[in-house]
């Protein structure tokens, strides 16, 4: 029977050691809560950190970019600019479309922003054109965020107009109602309509004008209230044949009489069922299609949203004819799930490696089982807290748990090793557990709170980067805290029941061999340490040199923002000469599609041509290239992009810009490349002067590639210069001229056909097949005040000019965005510095302002706060350690280990060819928390030896180093092996995880080697400094 030690021993662990059943049930409760939490947690690629973003689209067919800007965009911008919480407002006004993107502060709820946007639209309504076909429509979506799912709808038997009509009413509307869906767009422009193509010669011969025809059509097709009759006994509702539903009915419409004979619409026009906009088209691979892009609301969970769509699709497609085929071309969640699965596998691998290293050191199965239980229990218990905090299972939280594997095992190792030491000395297991746990309790608390202190600054990081890493930091802190609880409760209790002298002394051939090996290593370390302690100043110079080297490496290492991920989807923009027509652009697009589809890595392709709010001009096309799964192709996305661009370069007259889709989207505009730089001015003339000059210089920089600008001011314009005096004599107003031009060439929506399920438009235009180009203007006729017909050419001259194809604003002022990529041999930091240096050489006037946008702006912000972040982490840890040790000196000794970690991490990143990005910086901050553990374990035991055994400082620190060498080596290797799977990651999303693993493994290796020698030396030097300071104070007091 064991003799129990006094109740004063055991510290906070005593209660749990003495009550094994209660302790076991408590741990089972933590385990069950964690399992339930894991099943309840949503899955996503990254924490939901989107800015509240709303897009407002206004379509005004036929309007020029200048008209769209002044008549539509500007009135809306003035109202939006008064909203509180607005962070940034950008707009793009192109031919027939105005798109305004509103980005709000992170703290503003999206629903509140939505209410403000609706109120602003209502306030601007009276200022918008009266003939606007539809009011502005807003969507809770970020246009730069790639669609979560892309579907292609094709048919071999039905025209695209019928296909779109069915898809819009039976599929798109239902998907739009799913929670989390922000916007469903149908690209392809095949919305059904009745098209009226006037024969200009025919109406001129009859003395009619297009305005006469328009008035007749609008008056013949109405759908308004007619009232009802309420008699003594019955009520009767009035109805009439005031609606015309088909093209045949419109052909028979009488628009005028001549000599008593009716003139029907079919006599002067071709009337047919067609598409509302004939200058829009979409293709899936090589087949014309209706392409359905589904975008999520900012903040919505992408996995649950996509799952809901997948569940609904079968029942939606069942209602479609068999000839209509719906194909899912891309689903971003496929790669997100694969990335999360790979990270979970790496987490399991880290746990396995950590348990193996524990067995290697302890050489005892019962002793290995104890941390083998503590590690998964700590990690699983974290899931319960994550649910409470509304977190998700994503790459960052799983990375935090993977790194935590090496952290949480440290506490268990320290406890087991200390208890085992007493058992080997002959203590009974229960007494050894009480004594060892009580002795090590303060060390565990010190390790835990000093490590959590490192994570505190991450919680105060600003803007979107801070939001991004908040889940990472809190998840890691929770795992560390639960680990400390488990190590002070379950671990000593299990040691008291599972360890014994017999089990610890029981050895096999492997354990004997490993024991001898560790003894030789410790002996060699002891000899080396003795020599180092005899040459303290040389060792101190080494420590100082690591500090200097870390600063130099920090200055010269390439810096980036966020790793470029391979998500298997490439977004592309195809650019042609500015005067390109829709037919010309469609032909070029098909040529490029043929080239792209020949690449062995490409699985499918969707493309779109036309102006509809997502594409700014007719001379550009949007492409989405879906790659095969990563395990089915030989190259990663960057190599595929380079290969595709080389292949497309052979297609004449086009430029192709490609960029891989990313899980983290900070931009608010669809850009041609990954990074953006803007020039903003008070006028378009200023931009037209300086943009070409800057572009010329930027295109010569080797630090950037694929440089392009959205400044397109060479669009062909036929300027109708009306002689106002001549027009006035004939009684013709400028409104008459505009109406005649709009009727002829604006695809004017002049009437609406109402049905029970949908509404369709009647489109008026001139038939220009026989009079292409500017010659079509000669066919325009106007009605004079005396009823005569006057040709436009008699009162106006046609001048050919150039004008912008689109006009862009940023916060209500004209802006141009310059897009660029960064070549493989340069970093984003190099590119940013080169652009800033180039800008300075131009001496831009004061009314021109420049700014980086999107991820480049976030990079500048993150880079500027990084040094302060690290300083804050060090200060926080110093404060915690100072409070715990009640000393100003000992925390400095502990923190002296930090430069070695920085040197190792930065060297590893440079050797691996990785940039110092935000992921790597987080790794360095975590290293600050890890490497100081070595010093804490040494100093704790040295102080105890001085205080309790009366040892000299040199003997105390020497014995502490030898005594704690094995647990120090175990904990460091455990942390290293926890990060190793991340460093060696090769699967989906590996780009995101690898920098963290590389930095941590490199930092741990270098710091392990150096701190075992530098820490004891610095401990002794500070001890001497303290003694010298005390003697000086004592001397001054005696003299006084």
Curated annotation (Swiss-Prot):
One Pfam family from the record = ACR_tran
In terms of superkingdom, the source organism counts as Bacteria
Tell me how this protein sits in the membrane. Answer: Multi-pass membrane protein
Q: Which GO terms describe its cellular component?
A: plasma membrane
Q: Where in the cell is it found?
A: Cell inner membrane
What GO terms are given for molecular function? xenobiotic transmembrane transporter activity
Report the induction information. The mdtABC operon is transcriptionally activated by BaeR.
Its transmembrane ranges are 16-36, 347-367, 369-389, 396-416, 440-460, 472-492, 537-557, 863-883, 888-908, 911-931, 968-988, 998-1018
Query: Which UniProt keywords are listed?
Result: Cell inner membrane, Cell membrane, Membrane, Transmembrane, Transmembrane helix, Transport
- Tell me, what does this protein do in biology? The MdtABC tripartite complex confers resistance against novobiocin and deoxycholate.
Quaternary structure annotation from Swiss-Prot or TrEMBL: Part of a tripartite efflux system composed of MdtA, MdtB and MdtC. MdtB forms a heteromultimer with MdtC.
Family listed: Belongs to the resistance-nodulation-cell division (RND) (TC 2.A.6) family. MdtB subfamily.
Could you identify this protein by its name? Answer: Multidrug resistance protein MdtB
